[in-house]
Amino acid sequence: MSRKLFASILIGALLGIGAPPSAHAGADDVVDSSKSFVMENFSSYHGTKPGYVDSIQKGIQKPKSGTQGNYDDDWKGFYSTDNKYDAAGYSVDNENPLSGKAGGVVKVTYPGLTKVLALKVDNAETIKKELGLSLTEPLMEQVGTEEFIKRFGDGASRVVLSLPFAEGSSSVEYINNWEQAKALSVELEINFETRGKRGQDAMYEYMAQACAGNRVRRSVGSSLSCINLDWDVIRDKTKTKIESLKEHGPIKNKMSESPNKTVSEEKAKQYLEEFHQTALEHPELSELKTVTGTNPVFAGANYAAWAVNVAQVIDSETADNLEKTTAALSILPGIGSVMGIADGAVHHNTEEIVAQSIALSSLMVAQAIPLVGELVDIGFAAYNFVESIINLFQVVHNSYNRPAYSPGHKTQPFLHDGYAVSWNTVEDSIIRTGFQGESGHDIKITAENTPLPIAGVLLPTIPGKLDVNKSKTHISVNGRKIRMRCRAIDGDVTFCRPKSPVYVGNGVHANLHVAFHRSSSEKIHSNEISSDSIGVLGYQKTVDHTKVNSKLSLFFEIKS
């Protein structure tokens, strides 16, 4: 859900909090006393944008421009949450989502006593009315006044408003008055900026640890979280909608007006914005139109800019798979951070919102491609984009749904940094030489408790004698095969990374299949190979002030 929508929700809740001391009945209508509390050294988490990770650690300051936390004047404030993974979802710059960059997450703490006032409703006017507040002054500004704190603070130094992301959700969002927020101490939790254009990749890995990348939790009940969405149904719905949209008279006419050739970005965006406006009038996009009308980020201009950017990346010969993934998942209309496509879905009809969003996004990208690159078949391009998006979501999240795959290893697992790795069989730990051909070696990987990421694997090679078969090396998560991208990083080492995020733990296992190719029957001696181990890389950690990936080494034998 967007900050603006959160603001509305918080306003409704506040109305119940601000009732005069003599009007507790009204306050009870908007304040949830069972979830309100006073706490010493109250802490929460905040996601910060690229370029601000260092400055925010110096203290919280109200921005001089921009939304200042929310589009709605009543809800302008400093936002934080009790869930650090949810906070990470706000670390991407919405103005430049295709940069691949992300900011970070900080932990913020108030000194002394803080009253957390939990709200029930989302209408600012109602909240102010029920709490006996001024109807003309912004809600969050009144929350920071001495009068408000005296009436509702229960002896605390400040009042922070809270609101659940959705009915049944355990996550909570906090709204802090800007002046009060200056008292917050700031501690860095995680920094994605150090990864440069791979920052969003690191952010996705971090968020998926708790499946919190599904910002849909902010707007719908937990029963409709990303884990439980039926992607097969969404795929069918999306394709049906695309066919209906394509054949709709006004949309068909608008498509015929397309320049259908390479044009300037300005002309491409102008056409796509008009296409967006026309498409939203179709009944198949009625739910999405409602969301668009309440959330500025869904405006046609943003959709158009997003579609052009995605089309440019897809058309680029130099863009690697990660860059294309970043483009597809950029936090803009239609597609968001892992589950951002449903961001702002307030009608508890998430599946429909997702289908409508993907349908419109796919059509707009298909329309944009010939404007910035090659001419393509609109239907084919749209369907291909649908499959790419759905497949990516399934790869990230389906591992948490699929039945556990446990091949039964015959060697003792190596435990380190929360991971457990082992050769699947004793034979897998032996690299035999003296013949030409292929050999495969399986490694079982899991985590002891919390889901942890698999960043890749380092494989020793001998050019011309022992090479990695890149097309056959892959990783399977609970039986689902995921291809890997391999490249030589040194003359005798090859690094392979999954083409999609991979996590293990809590019943989710991975099987890494390493394939070697020998083009010569010449024997290999131990002193010819740079390392007698295969290194599995996990999460990033800091050692002696240097960031490194957790590494688990499995030793092998070379035999003739």
Curated annotation (Swiss-Prot):
It comes from the Viruses. InterPro entries: Diphtheria_tox_rcpt-bd_dom_sf (IPR036799), Diphtheria_tox_transloc_sf (IPR036801), Diphtheria_toxin (IPR000512), Diphtheria_toxin_catalytic_dom (IPR022406), Diphtheria_toxin_rcpt-bd_dom (IPR022404). GO terms for cellular component: extracellular space. It catalyses: diphthamide-[translation elongation factor 2] + NAD(+) = N-(ADP-D-ribosyl)diphthamide-[translation elongation factor 2] + nicotinamide + H(+). GO terms for molecular function: NAD+-diphthamide ADP-ribosyltransferase activity; nucleotidyltransferase activity; toxin activity. NAD(+) binds at H46, Y90. It holds the Pfam family Diphtheria_T. Its EC number is 2.4.2.36. The active site is at E173. Disulfide bonds join C211-C226, C486-C496. Keywords: Cleavage on pair of basic residues, Disulfide bond, Glycosyltransferase, NAD, Nucleotidyltransferase, Signal, Toxin, Transferase. Residues 1-25 form the signal peptide. Diphtheria toxin, produced by a phage infecting Corynebacterium diphtheriae, is a proenzyme that, after activation, catalyzes the covalent attachment of the ADP ribose moiety of NAD to elongation factor 2. Fragment A is responsible for enzymatic ADP-ribosylation of elongation factor 2, while fragment B is responsible for binding of toxin to cell receptors and entry of fragment A. Homodimer. This is Diphtheria toxin.
